[in-house]
Amino acid sequence: MPEFRMIDCGGAKLRCVIEGSGPLVVMVHGFPESWYSWRHQIGQIAASGFTACAIDVRGYGGSDKPFAVEAYTLEAIAADLIGLADVLSPGEPAVLIGHDWGAPIVWNTAFTNPDRIRAVAGLSVPFAGAPQRPFTEVFREH
């Protein structure tokens, strides 16, 4: 049976649903979802010999909801995932799985912390590679 925990990741407290033991697998939901979108995968991942951890990203569900817009950068959210891994799997690399908006979150986390990530998967979103320039510039052009 999964366990609900609030994990202090350093910059925010995240609500996590955790089941199993073994290498850490963190599941990151999309927009506008929550840990609940992973409810069918948690048990299967745990039964396969992993610690399955589905989170509410900061600003969602039971996790902290900072008021300042600046608190929602990809860097801050990636730091949450690394902080979570430091608590649940200290010194061991984690597997990250992201769906929808969770995909760029896990990709960014892997790009910026390659030594902390064992594997990464993005679901339902095509991988376009590392950004060559800020997305805001691209948006202004169109």
Placement of each model-derived feature along the sequence:
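Residue-level marker of motif borders
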Residues: 6, 24-25, 95
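N-terminal cap/lid segment of alpha/beta-hydrolase-fold proteins
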Residues: 1-13
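Residue-level preference for short coil/turn positions at secondary-structure junctions
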Residues: 10, 20-21, 48, 90-92
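Conserved HGGG/HGGXW glycine-rich cap/lid loop of the alpha/beta-hydrolase fold
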Residues: 15-64
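Pocket-edge positions in alpha/beta enzyme catalytic cores
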Residues: 6-8, 30, 69, 73
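Flexible "cap/lid" subdomain of the alpha/beta-hydrolase fold that forms the substrate-access gate
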Residues: 12-14, 38, 53, 60-97, ...
